[in-house]
C-alpha cells in the first residue's frame, strides 16, 4: 500500500487489475472487501513514521483533517480513542473505523473517484451474483 513517487495512483493498481479481470469475464464491475475482525495483524500499516511499512521509499500526501467523504456528504475530523488522537499516517489502520482514512489515503495518492467507484457498488454486485445463483439453482432443479 506504499505510494510510488514515480507513479501517482499506484495504490490503486490491484483494484484496477481486479476490476479489469471481472469486466473481462463479463462480471459486474464491483469489488467487495472486508477485514478479519478477529485481529488486525494483516491490516494496512503506516506509510509514515518509525513503523512505516514502506522502507526507504519516500512517501508524500499524508491524510490530513478535515477531509470529505467519497460521496461528499460527510466531513471527517481527527479520530480519537478516548483522549488519545489516532494518527492513521503513523499508526496505520488500527480499527475498522479508519476505513474512510484508508480510502482517503488512496485518493491522496492519485487514485481517482471513478477508480474507487467499484468499492461502492459491492452490495449491488453481491445481489446480482445471488440472483444468478438462484437462477442457476432453479435451472438445475428443473432438470
Predicted feature residues:
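Mid-to-C-terminal alpha-helical segments outside catalytic/metal-binding sites
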Residues: 61-143
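C-terminal regions of proteins
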Residues: 22, 34, 103-106
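Sequence contexts marking disulfide-bonded cysteines in secreted/extracellular proteins
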Residues: 3, 53-55
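Short secondary-structure boundary/capping segments
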Residues: 47-52
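Structural alpha-beta junctions
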Residues: 21-29, 108-114
Amino acid at each position: 500500500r506504499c505510494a510510488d513517487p514515480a507513479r501517482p495512483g499506484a495504490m490503486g493498481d490491484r483494484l484496477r487489475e481486479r476490476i479489469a479481470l471481472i469486466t473481462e469475464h463479463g462480471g459486474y464491475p464491483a469489488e467487495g472487501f472486508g477485514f478479519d475482525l478477529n485481529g488486525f495483524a494483516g491490516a494496512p500499516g503506516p506509510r509514515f513514521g518509525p513503523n512505516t511499512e514502506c522502507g526507504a521509499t519516500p512517501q508524500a500526501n499524508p491524510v490530513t483533517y478535515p477531509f470529505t467523504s467519497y460521496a461528499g456528504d460527510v466531513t471527517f475530523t481527527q479520530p480519537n480513542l478516548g483522549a488519545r488522537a489516532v494518527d492513521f499516517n503513523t499508526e496505520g489502520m488500527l480499527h475498522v473505523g479508519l476505513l474512510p482514512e484508508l480510502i482517503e489515503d488512496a485518493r491522496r495518492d492519485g487514485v481517482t473517484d471513478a477508480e474507487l467507484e467499484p468499492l461502492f457498488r459491492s452490495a449491488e454486485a453481491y445481489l446480482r451474483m445471488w440472483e444468478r445463483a438462484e437462477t442457476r439453482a432453479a435451472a438445475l432443479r428443473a432438470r
